[in-house]
């Protein structure tokens, strides 16, 4: 074979607008084509193997040497089988060729998407069967495929698919495989018999006749082109390029892609003929987007005796992928890895290495993908599209508009009525516009020819966008061009297409012409003067404008386009999104599982009245205004939603899952571990995993499918019951990934698949090798004495609170820097939010800590408790007033009384007055108080009479007795003096008590104020210690001097020294560096905050177990056995002092695990919380005793310290001196465990706490404050007010004689009235029994009455 290379030969004449591609075919009919698809359906797989560089397009414009890189570009999928195509010889009778024999490739239109690559001649030079004659074998020859590519495709006149509209790119091999022809023309179907626009059409095809076209040295270079022209006339061709190919049978690759620069052709023949790397060899000036392609059928018209087999070719779609490429020293790609093929590929790409050692590698973390959907939208009537489905559609300049609100639309149903030729959108995808919700939907429709499609494009400056119709791109818009099918008879065709090609205004001088351009979403100004249809090209219309309209003339001219066979229309769709709920939604049927309530806790896609996204819904407490539906945070993130079901749901982001790859280099096997996640979660979130992983999850293979383990969900591992002692692929939780090697000791015959990886358990059978015990005895050291000690421990429970003004820290007030900082988005907000979250975490941690460890409030102590408690302050003060403390109820009724204050002498006075006449003993009963005689200030009537008589007598007798009778007035005067003394004494006591109350109350207030002040000062010390952030910020502040590559750390210096552009670059370096430093600082704070929170939990446990109780855990509350613990507050934490005792002396004893009766081996006992021991001092053989485990205190073995157990080989058999529990035969008694006498016979001294005074507490010294608090408590206790007793004395005043006389007379009169009323008002009914009335009253006349019979009911 001769090495070949492309020779680029351009057969294009650039001076012409269209190129000459030769004359049309002169044949009146096309060769009949026979389609027998079953003959061509073969299974000859040729999957992509990127490890051999299959289908690799070399990076454009650069080269590499001896390097491995990851590269993002267009590549085929690893393992892609592609689409297989094969050409065949045609029908022949002897030496006469007949019908063409092809597959149905012309109607099999594919999406072009990102392009494709083609494997050509893979089976060349081998032996295969002839397609048309499967029983015939022949040498397989290489043949090149032909392609048809375009932007618009539809049906031929008979309804068969495969017609390309507008300009179409054709890649046509010719010259018996020695050249490739590329041309870009409008393909006009020919109307002859068997032609696309004629009768009996089945398919178009190309062909060549080897006998005449491929004779040695005389190849027909136009054989295939001429055959193609039999089916299509080539019109308006913009170019035709021809590329020569040297004939060979070597496997080669061909590729085609499209960018804004045009269509690019690639081939491995250009540079790397034998390696397979494709290099670009041509760029075709095709700028319309290629959307579709099809394979042009080709048939070889060989004679029947000379039929050959032709190699199949394979087309593989290109995808935007990431590949790991390995470049050789000479610069070619010799192997590659598709990074998205499987998890092992991801591992290689993550480490950019083709050689990875065995191990368990973390590759990435995948965010959970939605496992369902949630949809809520307005329910309304269906949008009415009927106006556009009836009548004659208007011309483009007179388009009709439908505006929809508050309705449900079905755009898919509407478009299904038409044959859509073109669907382009701006700011939205075609799929999204048919599935989203909007506040309004605007639909414009008009008749429009597809041949003028480009005039409606965004960048067009033609008459359509200038004077007829123009869409506004401020909102999402779509433009649809479609053909009305024949069966849609409700729409009638206009006679022709017409449009305005000119619209201008001439000013009043008739010389100045101003074009009147159409505004977006508005009608043309000339629509009022142009009729609904323009009849002839160049029709001219004019209208004189009124002065109000500015004067002058409005002129327009029109153009027409011939009506097509089928009406073609244009649809312009514009949608608007509302600020809240959107009422125009697609007409969809929702299942029950699309409700929020059915998807709680799951990662779902949601669409809520036009607001869509992804997240997890949970029930929450309602916030915000219900009528507004949506609740947002300060960063405009949706955080809550009021559902139609009446509930409020909060929304959070979906979680992420860490992924690891388990790889064994020896066997080249791997498995995937999804850490700490349930398998049901990963199976519903597959879309982001590798393609192989997704395939396994969909297949749900019971052997290699998801396997739940304690470390997460694994794929590619087979569960087994194997145990291994040495594991090179440990997974954690004593699990091991075991590759298929001879070390598994698993016979190959029982393995399901060679090369599998198994899940095994790690068995630590012999971690420590020890000698076998020779007897059931063992020696033991038990403490016999203890010494006390103190363990000091500090636990940090919080960190310094830190807040940073991000903008001030980064920019220091420079406006230029702050402007650039805005380009970093919400970085500063996130920083502050993270720091605030850390501070709140600290507050919650400290609050929870102290809420858990604080002492609960004590209940009041009531009288009656025994002991040495002084409860007198809490008891009510009792006042004794003598034996007669009160009068009887009758006395209270019969006498007037008054209660007065008693300074202390009233009771003595009252007792004295009871011994004789009150009027005579008043002065005798005067009491002494503080040296003064006092009497009560009240006097009864008798005293008043006696003193008044004495006073009057003394006054009246003065003249008769020469003044001697005045002595009779002395009692009266003394009574007045003594009573005034009593009033004064009472007032003095009241005044003294008032002073005591005021002083003691002020003393109590002062004590409480001092206590609060002291407590406040202590809290200030704690707060100062906790919030001391100088050390935390020192590192952050030091970074302000770092230049981070800028010319200076001072922004002001940079602004002063540099121009504007250089300032931006230098300041941006400082911003980037300082933000990085700030981000690292925040990350450190978050870690420290979480660590402190965990320590706070430990401190809470220690307070609850060590301070509030006595711990039984060894080493948890200090060293040794715990006795008591103390805790004090310390900066950023708590300071513990644990008091415990440590063993100081031990004794070595012989012990046994258990004891059994040698005569009855099933009768065995074991110690409870202790040991069976036999000391060296034991003189009697087999004499055993019991001791506790913490202190040596031998005691007899009884049922209280033992329990019956099953016999064990380590138990000691004894035959003599059996302890009591072994003397009985019953072993089924259920003994209740009791506490051992732990401190029995403990000999030790009183704990010495002297060392506690040496603890350095200067960091947080609260001694003075605690003493002050004690003084405050003492002062409060002393504030009890010991008031001088002021008793209550009740004075009774007896009534005078005339009151008693009137009282008695009243009682007698009342008795007489009652007697007369009862005795004299009837006979036989009085209180006197059966006495007659004449015995107590006058006689009444008697009347004789006849008796009457009376019935009493």
Curated annotation (Swiss-Prot):
<dbReference type="Pfam" id="PF01601">
    <property type="entry name" value="CoV_S2"/>
</dbReference>
<keyword id="KW-1170">Fusion of virus membrane with host endosomal membrane</keyword>
<dbReference type="Pfam" id="PF16451">
    <property type="entry name" value="bCoV_S1_N"/>
</dbReference>
<dbReference type="InterPro" id="IPR043607">
    <property type="entry name" value="CoV_S1_C"/>
</dbReference>
<feature type="glycosylation site" description="N-linked (GlcNAc...) asparagine; by host">
    <location>
        <position position="774"/>
    </location>
</feature>
<dbReference type="InterPro" id="IPR032500">
    <property type="entry name" value="bCoV_S1_N"/>
</dbReference>
<feature type="glycosylation site" description="N-linked (GlcNAc...) asparagine; by host">
    <location>
        <position position="870"/>
    </location>
</feature>
<keyword id="KW-0449">Lipoprotein</keyword>
<feature type="glycosylation site" description="N-linked (GlcNAc...) asparagine; by host">
    <location>
        <position position="1225"/>
    </location>
</feature>
<dbReference type="GO" id="GO:0055036">
    <property type="term" value="C:virion membrane"/>
</dbReference>
<feature type="region of interest" description="Fusion peptide 1">
    <location>
        <begin position="888"/>
        <end position="909"/>
    </location>
</feature>
<feature type="transmembrane region" description="Helical">
    <location>
        <begin position="1297"/>
        <end position="1317"/>
    </location>
</feature>
<keyword id="KW-0843">Virulence</keyword>
<keyword id="KW-1160">Virus entry into host cell</keyword>
<dbReference type="GO" id="GO:0075509">
    <property type="term" value="P:endocytosis involved in viral entry into host cell"/>
</dbReference>
<feature type="region of interest" description="Heptad repeat 2">
    <location>
        <begin position="1246"/>
        <end position="1285"/>
    </location>
</feature>
<dbReference type="InterPro" id="IPR043002">
    <property type="entry name" value="Spike_N_sf"/>
</dbReference>
<feature type="glycosylation site" description="N-linked (GlcNAc...) asparagine; by host">
    <location>
        <position position="1241"/>
    </location>
</feature>
<keyword id="KW-0261">Viral envelope protein</keyword>
<dbReference type="InterPro" id="IPR018548">
    <property type="entry name" value="Spike_S1_RBD_bCoV"/>
</dbReference>
<dbReference type="GO" id="GO:0046813">
    <property type="term" value="P:receptor-mediated virion attachment to host cell"/>
</dbReference>
<feature type="coiled-coil region">
    <location>
        <begin position="1258"/>
        <end position="1286"/>
    </location>
</feature>
<feature type="site" description="Cleavage">
    <location>
        <begin position="887"/>
        <end position="888"/>
    </location>
</feature>
<feature type="glycosylation site" description="N-linked (GlcNAc...) asparagine; by host">
    <location>
        <position position="66"/>
    </location>
</feature>
<feature type="disulfide bond">
    <location>
        <begin position="437"/>
        <end position="585"/>
    </location>
</feature>
<dbReference type="GO" id="GO:0039654">
    <property type="term" value="P:fusion of virus membrane with host endosome membrane"/>
</dbReference>
<feature type="glycosylation site" description="N-linked (GlcNAc...) asparagine; by host">
    <location>
        <position position="125"/>
    </location>
</feature>
<feature type="glycosylation site" description="N-linked (GlcNAc...) asparagine; by host">
    <location>
        <position position="166"/>
    </location>
</feature>
<keyword id="KW-0325">Glycoprotein</keyword>
<comment type="similarity">
    <text>Belongs to the betacoronaviruses spike protein family.</text>
</comment>
<feature type="disulfide bond">
    <location>
        <begin position="912"/>
        <end position="925"/>
    </location>
</feature>
<feature type="glycosylation site" description="N-linked (GlcNAc...) asparagine; by host">
    <location>
        <position position="719"/>
    </location>
</feature>
<dbReference type="InterPro" id="IPR043473">
    <property type="entry name" value="S2_sf_CoV"/>
</dbReference>
<feature type="glycosylation site" description="N-linked (GlcNAc...) asparagine; by host">
    <location>
        <position position="487"/>
    </location>
</feature>
<dbReference type="Pfam" id="PF09408">
    <property type="entry name" value="bCoV_S1_RBD"/>
</dbReference>
<keyword id="KW-0472">Membrane</keyword>
<feature type="disulfide bond">
    <location>
        <begin position="339"/>
        <end position="349"/>
    </location>
</feature>
<feature type="domain" description="BetaCoV S1-NTD">
    <location>
        <begin position="18"/>
        <end position="351"/>
    </location>
</feature>
<dbReference type="GO" id="GO:0016020">
    <property type="term" value="C:membrane"/>
</dbReference>
<feature type="region of interest" description="Fusion peptide 2">
    <location>
        <begin position="907"/>
        <end position="929"/>
    </location>
</feature>
<feature type="topological domain" description="Cytoplasmic">
    <location>
        <begin position="1318"/>
        <end position="1353"/>
    </location>
</feature>
<feature type="glycosylation site" description="N-linked (GlcNAc...) asparagine; by host">
    <location>
        <position position="592"/>
    </location>
</feature>
